[in-house]
Amino acid sequence: MRNPPPGYNTVAPYLLYEDAERAVEYLQGTFGFEERLAQPGAAGRMHHELLLGDDGLVMLGQASESFRSPRSLGIYPPVLIHFYVSNVDELHERAKAAGADVTDLETSPAGDRRFNATDLEGQVWVFAQRVS
């Protein structure tokens, strides 16, 4: 059953950061995310919604004692956040120019040209473009 509100996908990752405000600035400046929403959530912590492209929604917020970030737990993130983009080569160059920790571009057997990027708190992002 599909019942998201207008403008939302059925699934949207919600990432936790030790410094959510800094993470928003980093994701906007490094990868071109646009902030769609910023509003106070529980206990005064901000809730953010970022878009990449027309429908690439990711939500993020401030970590807390109850909801901890991978960084605060000292673990490698258990998930990768995967986005399809229209020009992966251009995004790769933009991310490198911003000083991001990125892998080299590669083409997968499935036909995705892609790279991985690790953000300032260790979340891992995969940006890809279908090329074949």
Which residues does each PLM region occupy?
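Vicinal oxygen chelate
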Residues: 1-14, 24-25, 31-86, 90-118, ...
